UniProtKB/Swiss-Prot annotation:
Organism placement in taxonomy: Bacteria, Bacillati, Bacillota, Bacilli, Bacillales
UniProtKB keywords: Cell membrane, Membrane, Transmembrane, Transmembrane helix, Transport
Localization annotation: Cell membrane
GO cellular component: plasma membrane
Membrane topology: Multi-pass membrane protein
Function: Part of a multidrug efflux pump. Confers resistance to cationic lipophilic dyes such as ethidium bromide, acriflavine, pyronine Y and safranin O. The efflux is probably coupled to an influx of protons.
Protein's recorded name: Multidrug resistance protein EbrB
Keyword match Amino-acid biosynthesis: no
Gene name for this UniProt entry: ebrB
Length: 117
């Protein structure tokens, strides 16, 4: 269960870092750069924690797929970016792929907890 929480935090952190990257305007705006660093550092830290209990293939596919979809939604909602019908279809395929990948996995044995948890 902790693995899923860490994975969710990794996704949120990655989307935050990507949003700050957009706001940095190619690293020409100083204040968002701290958000970029904090967001991506947190994302990889939480992703590494999630890998203690979640298979790499599932965790990484979920992190990148859901992160991609949420980043596109943030771009649409906050920055007025457009998403074409083909784009919506593509994002739907990404999410469907993540779901199918995760559903096709055999139930994993619970991995031993470590001191860090």
């Amino acid at each position: 269960m902790k693995g899923l929480l860490y994975l969710a935090l990794a996704i949120v952190s990655e989307v935050f870092g990507s949003t700050m990257l957009k706001l940095s305007e190619g690293f020409t705006q100083a204040w968002p750069i701290g958000g970029v660093i904090a967001g991506f550092l947190s994302a990889f830290t939480f992703l590494s924690f999630s890998l203690k209990t979640i298979d790499l293939s599932s965790a990484y596919a979920t992190w990148s797929g859901v992160g991609t979809a949420l980043t596109a939604i943030v771009g649409f909602l906050l920055f007025g970016e457009t998403i074409s019908l083909k784009g919506v279809f593509g994002l739907t395929l990404v999410i469907a792929g993540v779901v199918v990948l995760n559903q096709s996995k055999a139930p994993a044995k619970e991995k031993k907890q470590t001191v860090c948890e």
